[in-house]
Amino acid sequence: MDLIHLEDVDGNRCIVRVTGRSQPGVLTGHDILRADVLVSASFVDARLEMCLSPQDLSSWQQSLAELTQGGNATLGGARGLALGIHVNDERAVSVWVEDPDRLTTTLMIRPPGDWTDEHRGRLQDVREAWPREVVETAPMAYEWIPDHRH
């Protein structure tokens, strides 16, 4: 399921495809999601791995809500790969991907005009497919949310 899917007619694209839970059934990793980051342009074609925490998804939601021309939205970065989107104008965004171990690149994409609304829906779809099922009751202390069936 794609959390991010930015693509244009020139073949430039950046996709963050959520593939599942990182450690299903393990309290400390159950709510961490695995994702593939697919980046493609005339000068790059890469597949990278990313982990997304519930906090990453909340931060992404906040970034999308506040995004305006000249603004930025970011995802990840605390534990490795980071991705950012800068709104150049109403027709183009710059997407940067930084994986400290493998790749740093920036590409320009001209997404459809309603891409932010579409991505709010994508975030909701991801949250519905993999709902939060663990709560941190104290620093480094976790419990299943009541009514969770593990």
Segments the model singles out, each with a brief description of its role:
Residues 1-46, 147-150:
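N-terminal domain-start interaction segment
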Residues 11, 23, 42-44, 57, ...:
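Generic "edge-of-domain/loop-turn" microfeature
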Residues 15-19, 45-54, 85, 97, ...:
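Short amphipathic beta-strand/extended segments with alternating polar/hydrophobic composition
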Residues 27-34, 77-103:
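Intrinsic, low-complexity N-terminal interaction/targeting segments
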Residues 100-150:
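Mixed-charge, glycine-accented linear interaction segment located at domain edges/termini
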